[in-house]
Amino acid sequence: MKMPSAEVPTIDVSPLFGDDAQEKVRVGQEINKACRGSGFFYAANHGVDVQRLQDVVNEFHRTMSPQEKYDLAIHAYNKNNSHVRNGYYMAIEGKKAVESFCYLNPSFSEDHPEIKAGTPMHEVNSWPDEEKHPSFRPFCEEYYWTMHRLSKVLMRGFALALGKDERFFEPELKEADTLSSVSLIRYPYLEDYPPVKTGPDGEKLSFEDHFDVSMITVLYQTQVQNLQVETVDGWRDLPTSDTDFLVNAGTYLGHLTNDYFPSPLHRVKFVNAERLSLPFFFHAGQHTLIEPFFPDGAPEGKQGNEAVRYGDYLNHGLHSLIVKNGQT
């Protein structure tokens, strides 16, 4: 039975790139309404070439050999690899169909202070063989910074939505230190699909209910409906778009706003279809510390959240997600 759809507006975010203050405020108002509603909106007129993105990712998944995947696999799949974030997340025959490649900040080199200090969640990216996949790494690094810039622009809209100056968040969103990540996730079509989990309502699931541990999440996906969000009326399907980015507040933004912008609880329903899911998890840096606030004024007698260093928050949140939902 088809589930009703949640209300997910499409917002033209192009004014956030410009100088028209009135139009920017209007975009902020639309973001406010979306985040106080279903928690999701589609960002249109974002300026990203999503067809090229699809082409590169499809080619990558098509040409990677099993040995290449294993050589790049994170520690959970390859004990010889110390990486726990950057690397390949393997499909396991008969158990798990989804596979993905995750990469981090291209600025994380051996000379980066956090790499030299061995700070958790900071890893120098490992890449597929550049002779076999010559255009993959250059594209990925370019795409990372494209998405980081887009996310910073979107944060101007979030700042305006919260009654702040549009540049409120920018001092804390430095390129050199961002913990942001890209995941290139492939869900295959299979004749004999591995067992999948079932939600309490009987829905078959590829990934159970969860909150995104991020500042915001900016997702591109191909045109196969799969996401559901929990609303006051129960679970609802999220509409799809293969031209726009699906945006939602992460739990850190919820923490900062004392849940004025709560991170939406969502899940991935099982669909046996070939599709891509390509989230950009936008993060601040390890040492970022922003004081939480009440956008609509502090309720009488209510204590606000305490400031938490971003790296500590993310490390704890990602660990908790794996404990609850399992290794992706």
UniProtKB/Swiss-Prot annotation:
Query: What EC number(s) does this enzyme carry?
Result: 1.21.3.1
Broad class of enzyme this protein falls into: oxidoreductase
What's the superkingdom here? Bacteria
| Binding sites annotated in the UniProt record for 2-oxoglutarate | 275
Enumerate the residues binding N-[(5S)-5-amino-5-carboxypentanoyl]-L-cysteinyl-D-valine: 85, 89, 181, 187, 210, 212, 277
UniProt keyword list: Antibiotic biosynthesis, Iron, Metal-binding, Oxidoreductase, Vitamin C
**What residues bind isopenicillin N, as annotated?**
85, 89, 181, 187, 277
| GO terms of molecular function | iron ion binding; isopenicillin-N synthase activity; L-ascorbic acid binding
**What processes does the entry annotate via GO biological process terms?**
antibiotic biosynthetic process
Q: In which pathway does it act?
A: Antibiotic biosynthesis; penicillin G biosynthesis; penicillin G from L-alpha-aminoadipate and L-cysteine and L-valine: step 2/3
Catalytic activity from the UniProt record: N-[(5S)-5-amino-5-carboxypentanoyl]-L-cysteinyl-D-valine + O2 = isopenicillin N + 2 H2O
Instruction: Enumerate the cofactors the protein uses.
Output: Fe cation; L-ascorbate
Q: Which residues bind Fe(2+)?
A: 210, 212, 266
Please report the stretch or stretches of sequence annotated as the Fe2OG dioxygenase domain: 178-284
By sequence similarity, the record places it as follows: Belongs to the iron/ascorbate-dependent oxidoreductase family.
Instruction: Relate the protein's function as given in its record.
Output: Removes, in the presence of oxygen, 4 hydrogen atoms from delta-L-(alpha-aminoadipyl)-L-cysteinyl-D-valine (ACV) to form the azetidinone and thiazolidine rings of isopenicillin.
Q: Could you tell me what this protein is called?
A: Isopenicillin N synthase
Q: Which organism is it from?
A: Amycolatopsis lactamdurans (Nocardia lactamdurans)
Gene field: pcbC
